Amino acid sequence: MQKDYPYALIQFYATAPYTCSYLSDRVARSQVATPGHLIDTPVYSELVRNGFRRSGMFTYRPYCDHCRACVPVRIPVKRFEPDRSQRRAWKMHHELRANEQPLAYSEEHYALYQRYQGSRHAGGGMDQDNREQYAHFLLQSHVDTRLVEFREGDVLRMVSVIDRLSDGLSSVYTFYDPDQTHASYGTYGILWQIEVCRRLKLPYLYLGYWIKESRKMTYKVRFHPLEGRLRGEWRDIDPLRDRASE
């Protein structure tokens, strides 16, 4: 990482061990970057390239003692080619209207978030998030963050929170209408972000971490090609083989 200001002032510490939120039978630790007020968009972009991610004002990366399951992944958008199911999802939802909104609380957004968590992640803890926890998670940011809502007519179908980096976009979180069981909103959301990257001439869409053992993350390896940060370098990954990020 660069050594000039403000990079030289960034400090890192390791958290105490805690139960892994992805693999419940494992113990995790995180490496946290501080102080938060110095982590602006240029600094955060460099941190993301080094495997970090953020949750609200908390910038971290996995720092586990005996596990390397978390692989930071990104899509090189120039090389991406959608498969048949992705083309179908794009066509199915072509009438969705995307609107950028202020990074501010909306009762309508929170209601959709609650429905999504209760349906897709029941019992995971986030389904119990109150308004304050929701706001801390998605509406607090020290970088260039966009909140985009997707509507079908007047009906809110999906919300995406996206960070703009110096070399791409980082998909922070997306939640959508869980009652439309035939829909492919999550796939469409990623395809939409890929198109935004291309339009802005940004080379990468960062998708956070991929864990081979986590079924909830299988969707990420359906986007080809996919690069992972493995042993300190970004390269194309083989989902059947790769898993260690360091």
From Swiss-Prot:
It comes from the Bacteria. GO terms for cellular component: cytoplasm. Coiled coil: none annotated. GO terms for molecular function: arginyl-tRNA--protein transferase activity; leucyl-tRNA--protein transferase activity. InterPro entries: Acyl_CoA_acyltransferase (IPR016181), Asp_Glu_LeuTrfase (IPR017138), N-end_Aminoacyl_Trfase (IPR030700), N-end_Aminoacyl_Trfase_C (IPR007472), N-end_Aminoacyl_Trfase_N (IPR007471). It is an enzyme of class 2 (transferase). It is found in: Cytoplasm. Its EC number is 2.3.2.29. Keywords: Acyltransferase, Cytoplasm, Transferase. GO terms for biological process: ubiquitin-dependent protein catabolic process via the N-end rule pathway. It catalyses: N-terminal L-glutamyl-[protein] + L-leucyl-tRNA(Leu) = N-terminal L-leucyl-L-glutamyl-[protein] + tRNA(Leu) + H(+); N-terminal L-aspartyl-[protein] + L-leucyl-tRNA(Leu) = N-terminal L-leucyl-L-aspartyl-[protein] + tRNA(Leu) + H(+). HAMAP family: Bpt (MF_00689). Functions in the N-end rule pathway of protein degradation where it conjugates Leu from its aminoacyl-tRNA to the N-termini of proteins containing an N-terminal aspartate or glutamate. Belongs to the R-transferase family. Bpt subfamily. PANTHER family: ARGININE-TRNA-PROTEIN TRANSFERASE 1 (PTHR21367), ARGINYL-TRNA--PROTEIN TRANSFERASE 1 (PTHR21367:SF1). This is Aspartate/glutamate leucyltransferase. It comes from Aromatoleum aromaticum (strain DSM 19018 / LMG 30748 / EbN1). The gene is bpt.
